[in-house]
Amino acid sequence: MADGGEREELLSPSPVSPAKRQCSWPSPQAHHPRGSPGAAGGGAGGVGSSCLVLGARPHLQPDSLLDCAAKTVAEKWAYERVEERFERIPEPVQRRIVYWSFPRNEREICMYSSFQYRGGPGAGAAGGAAGASPAEEGPQPPPGAAAPAGSAPGGVAAGASPGLGAGAGAAGCGGEGLPFRRGIRLLDSGSVENVLQVGFHLSGTVTELATASEPAVTYKVAISFDRCKITSVTCGCGNKDIFYCAHVVALSLYRIRKPDQVKLRLPISETLFQMNRDQLQKFIQYLITAHHTEVLPTAQKLADEILSSNSEINQVNGAPDPTAGASIDDENCWHLDEEQVKEQVKLFLSQGGYCGSGKQLNSMFAKVREMLRMRDSNGARMLTLITEQFVADPRLTLWRQQGTNMTDKCRQLWDELGALWVCIILNPHCKLEEKSCWLQQLQKWSDLDVCPLEDGNYGHELPNITNALPQSAIHSPDSLSRPRRTVFTRAIEGRELHWQDSHLQRIISSDVYTAPACQRESERLLFNSQGQPLWLEHVPTACARVDALRSHGYPKEALRLTVAIINTLRLQQQRQLEIYKHQKKELLQRGTTTITNLEGWVGHPLDPIDCLFLTLTEACRLNDDGYLEMSDMNESRPPVYQHVPVAAGSPNSSESYLSLALEVALMGLGQQRLMPEGLYAQDKVCRNEEQLLSQLQELQLDDELVQTLQKQCILLLEGGPFSGLGEVIHRESVPMHTFAKYLFSALLPHDPDLSYKLALRAMRLPVLENSASAGDTSHPHHMVSVVPSRYPRWFTLGHLESQQCELASTMLTAAKGDTLRLRTILEAIQKHIHSSSLIFKLAQDAFKIATPTDSSTDSTLLNVALELGLQVMRMTLSTLNWRRREMVRWLVTCATEVGVRALVSILQSWYTLFTPTEATSIVAATAVSHTTILRLSLDYPQREELASCARTLALQCAMKDPQSCALSALTLCEKDHIAFEAAYQIAIDAAAGGMTHSQLFTIARYMELRGYPLRAFKLASLAMSHLNLAYNQDTHPAINDVLWACALSHSLGKNELAALIPLVVKSVHCATVLSDILRRCTVTAPGLAGIPGRRSSGKLMSTDKAPLRQLLDATINAYINTTHSRLTHISPRHYGEFIEFLSKARETFLLPQDGHLQFAQFIDNLKQIYKGKKKLMLLVRERFG
């Protein structure tokens, strides 16, 4: 008996629930049908009597006939039915039924106490085989199928070795923080106490041990159960989660592992029935006294109702008993907190994919699949709750109103939701009324405006441009006229599918089903030439059947149907190949083909290929009977597979499931299929392909798998319209680059010729290659270009091109040192890759591989890198590319590694590769640099050859673009007098044209630096004539050039200065600049820095005489004009600055002999003209009188 605190919790009043069914009893005069009162396990002592303890039997002792019968009854029948069926039930029988009614398998406890249950895809098989869930009342295999082996209840039975239970627990969950693991630790630490089973009710206390921060806490736990399922749980910890807390787990495992230590009583109504009136009165009074503060109001209320003849309580026979199990009409399913499921899903959706909510929702979907495998009715129940929250997501309305698509993460969750509903609708043992109810609900959700569409769009996009073109005849009709297909449409369409077909039943029920010796005409299509059964159905639909079988715990049946589907695909492949051979000549002449598969299998909403692949590989997994081993860090180890022969007696028995898995994956990935419409659909194709390839990479290729791989690759290469690797493909078929990269890497060690042939064939990207003939409508599959944007349908084109580049890079790496293969790969790259950036990446990759730091250079691959670089130069010569300079520098580096002949070649053919600026400033300059000479160890003739080519290039570039190349040409030609003169003349001739003053000044400074001052003066004079410096441009960048030009002319002599000053006066109108020039010219005598041989006069120049007089007058006039200009818009805060300006002007005015008179007259004029500016004029008087 539990202590008083236990009873407080369990006896709190509540309305009658399924766990507390009405228990009736005969009148006092009636005969007691269950034997004498003393026959009950508790004896006449009732509450105070000693409890009956069940002894443990020897571990290997077989169950008695009583136990066998009690097990079956406890699993299948509600206890009320037992009571109705038999007038008298002996007490030992009652005890054994109550005993065996508790769940017997720890796997089920783990499933309801952890998201991260470690049951892998094969767990359904294990669960079904172990009888882990006697979930449904008599679950049957699909019609015609054999029941799963060992379907009798078993699992971890009572009395089993505790070690086995611990193993199951360890194999069941990963991660020390999970409730199941924590429950095991609580159980192992002895924290479970006061365990009492009263009928179908288990109670006990669980103590959380003290920690450094928290004291020990004891929680009261109560569990109700019925027919080997836990139907309700209560724990004092107040757990708010979808699944059971660690305390419920600990108590449940205690009952499973230590049944001999649990005090067992029959339902409390049985004990009460054995008491006489005095005992009952004593029992009630003691109970009220022990809990008077809690139950006294309820007790008085019940007493009043019982004493009232008209009360409702007296209208019903019997009274509720929470320990008597469920009634016949109660639904028999495991306890699932529906409100918590709703709240958790709502919370995860509100987080919008952040905080790991996507992973949590995926875990919930995985839990649904796990329940389906265990044939637990809560799977569909939980999925319904999840779907209701998904449909109520407020973001759906927002996305629809804005006409935007939902996020990829959310879209993937919706896809999984739709796929799960397909599995549920195709449940092979689904009752018709259940299926009808689900279909009604699905139709209701599908009719909602916010229900996401199957293609990932909301239909607000403009009609696809390709729908109006001739080639769109192969597509479905315009999106505006298409039937609306939501994520639930596939599941709703499942209403037409059934399992009653006799051929289908024979396929899934027998491994040895073959064609009969005498076939009727209607049966010939059902078998291939070897007598193997075929299943002729739409492939994704057939695979959905496989998924449904697999998901509902029928792995053998799923395998049989999978083999039949693969035999069908093989036959279709063979027939299409034969048809293609007859049409091959015509198709090759046309250069185009039709698509036989309008609906691709990879990226399909039903994911058919992945379904078949997983079904087959699950049968071949080695580790832990199909369970995915997980570390405590939840990191999965890659699965290990072995060859498992197809079931003995099968026509396919010479093959293994693993080879079939590889074959069907290759078939699906190699299928030629149209690129679907819409960004999400295209992205899904790429994502699913990569997922399937990652699973293929987990297979260790042995001889048998290599043979399968070779055979299928040959079929794909020879294939016609069904193969994406055939000789002719449709221009809008999905490229095979990613798939071919896997095939190339897998085949290379075993069959290099086949691997290269396949990879080279896959390099195609027809949607780009046929664009040149886009205007040609003679072929029905050519697209007319009616929009300026490039290929508007192919949203993932960038990703596809990058995968094409990866394939090419893989081939280049593998072919290192093989000249013939490298040449073939180079030609394929040049023909099929159309992105200059990607070709440049390939060139860089080839260069890195060809020039390793720890070994010698590979010249063949280096030449390939150079060829690719040259192609990039030609492709980007007339287009804008922000990486162009990087590309040019890299090409020169690559050519340098190749050798001097490569440098000479690019110098001589520069006009096809570079702009004049690039050729002179980067290419030629690098080619003749000291670093290059040392790197190549060039001798004198080679250096001269390079220099000659560089000079020729420089002159050609200078002629073509003198503005940008004149200076570079002079630099490159400075060591050759004739070439230098030619470059100089080009610069002079161009000076009168479009060259700017800054360009001319730069060249002039260079000429002075090289010792040609007169030529520098000539260029500076030309530059001065192109300059115009306004009065207020006192910070113009050309001021330094003007000052330098004046200093140059002054250093050359009086005549040069006299020639330049008129140009200065004409071009410069800024007073401060002119005054600065004038001051510099008067400080030193002209000609002091002149050329050798020219004599200087040695006298300072006078400002009153030419040529400085003209400069002086211009400076004074500039000051006067600037003064008036500044006074027009002057503000008081600039008065001080203006006075300083006048002070500088006075210095210039005072240079001539009568300068003071001119300045005084100037000031007087200012006072007269601007007398309104009194404050300013006052400052002028104070400073200048």
Swiss-Prot record:
InterPro entries per UniProt: Znf_SWIM (IPR007527), ZSWIM4-8_C (IPR048370)
One of the Pfam families matching this protein, by short name: ZSWIM4-8_C
Gene Ontology CC: Cul2-RING ubiquitin ligase complex; extracellular space
Organismal lineage: Eukaryota, Metazoa, Chordata, Craniata, Vertebrata
Ranges annotated as SWIM-type zinc finger: 219-256
Region (Disordered): 1-45, 123-153
Keywords assigned: Metal-binding, Zinc, Zinc-finger
Annotated GO MF terms: zinc ion binding
Protein name: Zinc finger SWIM domain-containing protein 5
Compositionally biased intervals (Basic and acidic residues): 1-10
